Amino acid sequence: MSEHNYQSDREVAEDPFLNYEASANQLSSNSRESTPRGSPWRAGMRSASLMTEPLEDSMYSDNNYLDNGVSFTKDENPLYSPSWPSLADANVNSMKSNNAIQEHKAAKFVSEKSLEKVSTADNNLVLQELENLRERLNQVELQLSERPSSYLGYHNNLSPYRSPNSYPSLLPSTHSPHSPAPLSTMQTALMRLRTYHPSPIILKPVEQAVNHAITLVNTSPSSVVDALCRSLAELCLGLVQEAIDASILSQQESSNSLDLVRHTPPLNYTSSVDSSPQRMASDSYGRPSLHLNDPFPSVDLQSNELSHHNVRTTLFSDDSRFHSKIHTHSTPPSQMYSAASHFRYRSDPSTRHVSNSTNKSSLHPSPTSLRVAHPIIPQRASPASQSFPSLQDTPSP
């Protein structure tokens, strides 16, 4: 019994996992029994089972003192000692696999980031090209917007781009049902524009914009870029249309032999082309309106009312100061005009030709007419004839 108890006590005493003091004092050739329970290799096993990163030198330089105060270096650590070859090999293999997984994840992350960077750079380049194209088109639009509104829409029937049925090659293609194909449409529009020989200020930016848009459509397969290019192509077509209209108008103006400065507003053909024979005398001399080619109203002593009406509407069509000063209460207007007209036309029939051939107003007879009408000069003493010189001395109200 005692022998059995001794044997059991010895087994208990020799077991390092049950009695710390016995295992610490008893040494044997067995490395498991000679190592205390709180030995650093156990802590190393626990840390190795939890770690996913490889061990660093700082673990051994900063944490040299472990549970029981025994210090180890990296070379003396039992984790790397050949006493546990299977455990060390397993830990090393697991750490290598973990490192391989981490390296694979890092490489995948870096490759994704690099692809994102490359795609972002390409997108920025395409957007920059589109922005440059927009700027060029805006310059052309600003140059064309300086023209008056009479240029735009004045010759809608002269261009094939106003209606889609007028030109078969400009019909929308099957690739895009909403907008015309930018390649064929812009090339056709540019060829059409060159036939009119427009100004280089308009032609050069349009050519550059069309070439850039065609290049972007060919080199950028993205749907967003394609849609942007098609929108820019439609804008370019509109600008080409306005340039063609302006070129047609400039050719028509040159064919009419009008001395106009280039890119100036056209003349109003309804009022200014045929208005040179009807130039007013008041425009040059500051006097009441009197048409040079209109004959002076016929005066007859038997029809004073008719002559009074004609002269009044011709000479004093506007409400000027002459109208209020001549029509005084002392002299009736009918007698005044009849006396003045009688004075002018009684002297000589050639007087009418002389007075109409000159650019002076009928209120101031020429010296020739005065010499011809010398026998009738005493008639100027009448009140009707004295009212005419008073016009120059009367101050303006």
Swiss-Prot record:
Compartmental location: Cytoplasm; Cytoplasm, Cytoskeleton, Microtubule organizing center; Cytoplasm, Cytoskeleton, Microtubule organizing center, Spindle pole body
Q: What happens when the gene is disrupted?
A: Abolishes cytoplasmic microtubule nucleation from non-SPB (spindle pole body) sites, but does not appear to affect the formation of astral microtubules. Fewer and thicker microtubule bundles, with microtubules curving around the cell tip. Cytokinetic actin ring displaced from medial region. Curved cell shape.
Q: Where is the composition biased (Basic and acidic residues)?
A: 1-13
Record PTM Phosphoserine, positions in chain: 366, 396
Q: Where is the composition biased (Polar residues)?
A: 22-37, 269-281, 352-369, 382-397
| Keyword line | Cytoplasm, Cytoskeleton, Phosphoprotein
One example of a Gene Ontology biological process annotation: mitotic cytokinesis
**Positions of the UniProt region annotated as Disordered:** 1-44, 269-298, 346-397
* One GO cellular component term noted in the UniProt record for this chain: cytosol
- Main subcellular location: cytoplasm
Quaternary data: Interacts with mto1; the interaction is direct and required for efficient binding to the gamma-tubulin complex. Interacts with gamma tubulin complex subunits alp4, alp6 and gtb1.
Functionally, this protein is described as follows:
Acts together with mto1 to promote nucleation of at least a subset of cytoplasmic microtubules, by recruiting the gamma-tubulin complex to the interphase microtubule organizing center (iMTOC) and to the equatorial MTOC (eMTOC) during anaphase. Does not appear to be required for cytoplasmic astral microtubule nucleation from the spindle pole body (SPB). Required to establish the eMTOC, and thereby to tether the cytokinetic actin ring.
Which protein, by its recorded name, is this? Gamma tubulin complex adapter mto2
Q: Which organism is it from?
A: Schizosaccharomyces pombe (strain 972 / ATCC 24843)
